[in-house]
């Protein structure tokens, strides 16, 4: 009996391979994959939204515990990717600010993600690649993922 592979199997396999490749490349910048995601979120809030970010924002956005966020941020600070500043409005909050090192790493991370996108669509025409993106967004929304979440985007979306 010839069974076709499940769609979720394809998605899982692609996600695993892409995640491993991304992790290896991001590590050359001195970041873990989680730190890379945090870096992008903080960058996005600073650059695109014009807002500051604190640990609580990251906890809520990524749906993870304070202790996890705190550990990641402390390691990022120790590595020179960000600084903390006490909020003038609420002294319990510490705003996160990216350093120049972080901005440089972010630019490299965007390039790495663009390379991954190009690899995913290498055998597709431009129209097929656009349709693939549209279908991925629909599928993501169907399972409760915000398809327009603030993660690095391809060159066409920037």
Protein language model regions, located:
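Pre-recognition alpha-helix immediately N-terminal to the DNA-recognition helix
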Residues: 6, 10, 17, 21, ...
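Charged, amphipathic alpha-helical coiled-coil/dimerization segments
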Residues: 74-134
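N-terminal leader segment of winged-helix/HTH proteins
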Residues: 1-29, 79, 158
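Short, hydrophobic-biased segments on the C-terminal half of alpha helices
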Residues: 55, 73-74
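Short, locally clustered residues in the helix-turn-helix/winged-helix DNA-binding domain
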Residues: 15, 40-47, 110, 137
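C-terminal regulatory/oligomerization modules of transcriptional regulators
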Residues: 1, 49, 127-158
């Amino acid at each position: 009996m010839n069974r076709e592979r499940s769609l979720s199997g394809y998605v899982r396999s692609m996600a695993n391979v892409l995640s491993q490749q991304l992790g290896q490349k991001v590590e050359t910048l001195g970041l873990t994959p989680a730190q890379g995601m945090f870096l992008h979120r903080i960058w996005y809030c600073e650059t695109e939204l014009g807002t500051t970010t604190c640990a609580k924002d990251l906890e809520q956005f990524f749906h993870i515990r304070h202790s996890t966020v705190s550990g990641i941020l402390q390691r990022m600070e120790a590595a020179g990717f960000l600084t903390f500043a006490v909020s003038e409005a609420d002294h319990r909050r510490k705003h996160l600010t990216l350093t120049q090192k972080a901005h440089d790493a972010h630019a490299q991370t965007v390039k790495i993600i663009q390379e991954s996108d190009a690899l995913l669509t290498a055998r597709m025409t431009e129209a097929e690649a656009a349709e693939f993106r549209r279908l991925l967004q629909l599928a993501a929304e169907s399972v409760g993922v915000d398809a327009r979440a603030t993660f690095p985007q391809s060159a066409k979306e920037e």
